[in-house]
Amino acid sequence: MRNEVEALPQSEPRFQNEAHALATEMSTLDIDSLQQQLDCSRRLAAENWQRFQHFFSAKKIPALLAYNGQAYKHLKASTLTESDLAFAQQHLWITCFLYGLLRPLDGIVPYRMEHTVKLSLTGGRPISQYWKGRLTDFLIASVKADDGILLHLATEEYEHLFDWKRVQSEVSVVQPLFYVEKDGRLQMQAVWAKSLRGAMTRHVIERRIATPTDLAAFSYEGFAYEPRLGEPAYPHFVRRENVMTL
């Protein structure tokens, strides 16, 4: 299935010019500078130095297949049908620090970028600040052109790409929260939260979810909607784990 997805026609990222400019400056950094900017090991810095050196000649792949974090493992994009991908292309935005916003079939090359990276192009400010003025109006207009509802399934660090208070004031933001209940206490566990975001994204795509209330039917790995908790903008999904003590 992955080969079939890769064979589909690729779209061009909306902010490709900006991404190319950022990648060009990243390619001028040495490995030591990359290690500091990306806050990573020297091995990863060397790997990404190579990536940026060959950025413009590397093979492009659809954005939905380019990431391998916890959320994407549970999204399982390579097994989506062509009609699923067509729906996702119309309704899903992927947030990232190099390309800004991506559609699922936008062609991109592998990279690593952190929101704290500071470049001459960004005026010495974190790259998230560089994007804020470019993406906020675009995202708001995109959501309003659809149904005015934004289902927020990105991790909170990506909110830095936008004037998030403006986004919340101009469109209806629904942000599901995922908790594990142990001994009567609710705990948000990062790995589970990331996994559930990916699984819920797939659920929305496969079932063509159109309204927030339809999310109540979502269940995954023991997580289910808990109507007694949260509020419409923050629906809670809870997994109950029984802990026995002796």
Task: Name each model-derived stretch.
Residues 1-79:
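Active-site helix-to-loop segments that bind/position phosphate- or nucleotide-bearing substrates
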